């Protein structure tokens, strides 16, 4: 299977000289900051957070290190801003009204593909880094919480057994995160529908075994 490719590039453009009006200057500064963060995310995800210095970032971005320090105080700040931004996007998505598993998965894959390096930093790199793990825990716990609520209202037996319900919710969170990571790195975009069908059928099978007293199944 061909691996999916990212359109991100580590090279960043240089702003033209000049002193525009304050509002335009602020907008340009924000655009520049966003551009730098996207490029930094690609380098950090590829090389590893702890193995990448500010010098290495600047070199691979093709800019002087002073440019990075003009926008960010440290590499740690860059990493945390990247993680918080993708986590905020994830939280915004998950706060929407539930419209079914299929719809949710479409939105999740779209988000992860559009921000592949950032999502991998959140879902993989922060999970293995003690200092950054709280970001991963927020991602993981959001899936656990939503799954727990769905199971609680769908199954009388699981409603009364919080331990088993939490076990199921934890399993679903781990399953989905691992599946999404693997798919955005290896699955072709034009086969996303196959991923949605596979994920939906997999969860249906699990829920059927976990909730024999319920007629609810993911759609």
Q: What are the residue ranges of the model-derived segments?
A:
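C-terminal effector-binding regulatory domain of bacterial HTH transcription factors
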Residues: 210-219
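Basic, helix-initiating cap at the start of DNA-binding domains
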Residues: 1-47, 51-60, 76-80
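Short, hydrophobic secondary-structure boundary micro-motifs
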Residues: 120-123, 135, 192-193, 215
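Alpha-helical structural segments
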Residues: 31-42, 46, 60, 70, ...
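Short helix-capping/turn signature of helix-turn-helix
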Residues: 72, 124-129
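Amphipathic alpha-helical packing segments from all-alpha helical-bundle domains
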Residues: 130-156, 163-181, 194-211
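Secondary-structure edge/capping motif, primarily at the C-terminal ends of alpha-helices
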Residues: 97, 119-126, 154, 180-187
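Short hydrophobic/aromatic patch on the recognition helix
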Residues: 54, 61-72
């Amino acid at each position: 299977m061909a691996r999916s490719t990212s359109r991100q590039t580590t090279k960043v453009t240089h702003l033209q000289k000049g002193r525009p009006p304050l509002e335009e200057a602020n907008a340009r500064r924000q655009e520049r900051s966003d551009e730098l963060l996207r490029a930094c995310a690609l380098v950090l995800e590829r090389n590893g957070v702890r193995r990448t210095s500010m010098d290495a970032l600047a070199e691979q971005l093709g800019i002087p290190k002073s440019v990075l320090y003009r926008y960010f105080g440290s590499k740690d700040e860059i990493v945390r801003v990247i993680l918080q931004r993708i986590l905020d996007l994830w939280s915004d998505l998950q706060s929407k009204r539930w419209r079914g598993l299929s719809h949710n998965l479409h939105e999740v894959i779209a988000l992860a593909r559009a921000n592949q390096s950032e999502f991998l930093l959140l879902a993989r790199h922060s999970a293995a880094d003690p200092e950054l793990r709280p970001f991963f825990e927020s991602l993981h716990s959001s899936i656990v919480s939503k799954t727990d609520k769905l199971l609680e209202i769908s199954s009388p037996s699981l409603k009364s057994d919080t331990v088993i319900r939490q076990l199921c919710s934890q399993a679903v969170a781990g399953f989905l995160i691992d599946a999404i990571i693997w798919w955005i790195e290896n699955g072709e975009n034009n086969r996303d529908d196959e991923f949605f069908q596979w994920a939906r059928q997999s969860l249906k099978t699990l829920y059927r075994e976990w909730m024999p007293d319920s007629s609810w199944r993911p759609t």
